[in-house]
């Protein structure tokens, strides 16, 4: 007879809402340090599952982040460093040669 084997004792811990725990009713858009906790590295708002907020406070956080972006307190998108594929795929010796050539070109006019 087929049955499902379940692992006992491995229940996911449910995250509690930060605002409900601290009994905060207002999410301030000017408090950038707290809002950065709800924004990921790219600059997009983290989902409710990741933050643990309840639906009510997640909507308030979303509104506060959008207001902070409009007031230029938070960036819309964070600048990412992009690496050219040709430099990444080339062997290390070629990369060092290219970098050395660039450094020499920069030093030559200054001397």
Curated annotation (Swiss-Prot):
Pfam families associated with the record: Ribosomal_S18
MF-aspect GO terms: small ribosomal subunit rRNA binding; structural constituent of ribosome
Coiled coil: none
Biased composition (Basic and acidic residues): 98-111
A Gene Ontology term for the protein's cellular component: cytosolic small ribosomal subunit
Domain of life: Bacteria
Region listing for Disordered, in residue ranges: 90-111
Keyword list, A-Z: Ribonucleoprotein, Ribosomal protein, RNA-binding, rRNA-binding
A biological process from GO: translation
InterPro entries: Ribosomal_bS18, Ribosomal_bS18_sf
Cited SUPFAM superfamilies: Ribosomal protein S18
Function: Binds as a heterodimer with protein bS6 to the central domain of the 16S rRNA, where it helps stabilize the platform of the 30S subunit.
Subunit details: Part of the 30S ribosomal subunit. Forms a tight heterodimer with protein bS6.
Family: Belongs to the bacterial ribosomal protein bS18 family.
Name assigned to this protein: Small ribosomal subunit protein bS18
Organism listed in the record: Mycoplasmopsis synoviae (strain 53)
Gene, per the UniProt record: rpsR
């Amino acid at each position: 007879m087929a049955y499902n084997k379940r692992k006992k004792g491995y229940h996911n811990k449910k995250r509690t809402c930060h605002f409900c725990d601290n009994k905060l009713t207002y999410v301030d858009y000017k408090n950038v340090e707290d809002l950065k906790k709800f924004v990921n590295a790219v600059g997009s708002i983290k989902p409710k599952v990741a933050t643990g907020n309840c639906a009510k406070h997640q909507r308030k956080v979303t509104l506060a982040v959008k207001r902070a972006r409009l007031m230029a307190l938070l960036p819309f998108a964070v600048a990412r460093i992009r690496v050219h594929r040709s430099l990444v795929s080339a062997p290390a010796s070629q990369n060092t040669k290219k970098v050395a050539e660039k450094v020499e070109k920069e030093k030559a006019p200054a001397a």
